Amino acid sequence: VLYRFLILLIFPVSLLAQRPGETPVEAWPRSFKAKPVDLRINDKTEDGSLVVESPHFRMVAETRIGRQDLTRFARVVESVPQLIKSHPLRLWNSPRKSITNILLCKDETSFVKAGGDEGAVGWWDGHKERVLIRSDYFLAPPQTENSRLQAQPDEGLLVHELVHASMSASLWRLPPWFTEGIAEYFSVCHQGGGWYLFRDLDSLIRNHLRRAISRNKVGEHFHLVPVPSILALSHQDWIKASQSQPGGNAYLPYATALLLVHYHLHGGAERRAKTSAHLAKIQGLSPRNKMPAFPTEEPGFIQKRLVNYWSSRGLQLIFREQ
């Protein structure tokens, strides 16, 4: 699920320090580029919709989209299972269906009618095992007031929801800060057309957050939802928290979640190893088993480390209830 705001207003402290002799659990990718896949496009449907079929997905577009753009979007869509399957973390936990449906809804009315939540722009429907995307937002996302660039499709929105689809059988076993944060992590790493960049993550995340939470900047500081509040949210509470942010910036919880995932994956080999082991462990558990707690740390400690780390990288943060 991804909520985005729809209106835009006019000495280093090392988080990543590794102990001497520590090595990564597995080699971390520096980049990833999706392999070409076979596509079938049907633009002769009775209801006027466009249908694209690929090895993992069947995408239906309610609005007219050029074949070249459809081909590119399908390449982005297919890149996600390729990436998640090959990633060193045990994230892939595929849907029961071999083909996942994606519906590009023409507007919010169609999106909500199909089962999406009002105010959201992307939605993973776990019951029907399909992805819903608001095409009006996806194809022309809001731009900052002083931007002279033509709006480009928000391919990161596709990546976010399809990460959920790729992890669907594990979502209920993981806290929402991790499932939403990891989806945003891959979304930020996606550079377009199924190409992902995992090096220079500090710059990618910093620049992304400067845009995404620009309206929450006071002076030189960006105001975020506190770490203790985010770590304590249930999946149902997450939806409420996203919908209730002052000023309508539903992205704020995602911003903190993104920083938390970066902390657990790039905050040293020990944190990454614990995260990796936990992800592997939960895949083998029966629904009857009690779910083990996610291996994290004291929230106040993490929050202090985040403030210090990102301040040395050009992102001044204040964690405060809005």
Task: Place the predicted regions along the sequence by residue.
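Bacterial N-terminal signal peptides that target proteins for export
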Residues: 1-6
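Hydrophobic h-region of N-terminal signal peptides that target proteins for export
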Residues: 7-17
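Flexible, glycine-rich phosphate/dinucleotide-binding loops
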Residues: 14, 111, 192
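A generic alpha-helix preference that emphasizes hydrophobic side chains
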Residues: 14-15, 99, 180, 258
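N-terminal low-structure segments adjacent to metalloprotease catalytic domains
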Residues: 17-53, 71, 75, 300-322
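Juxtacatalytic substrate-recognition/specificity segment
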Residues: 25-28, 46-175, 285-294
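Surface-exposed acidic, glycine-flexible loop patches that form ligand/cofactor-binding
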Residues: 42, 89-94, 250, 263
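Acidic/His/Gly-enriched intrinsically disordered linker/tail segments
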Residues: 45, 122-138, 153, 173-322
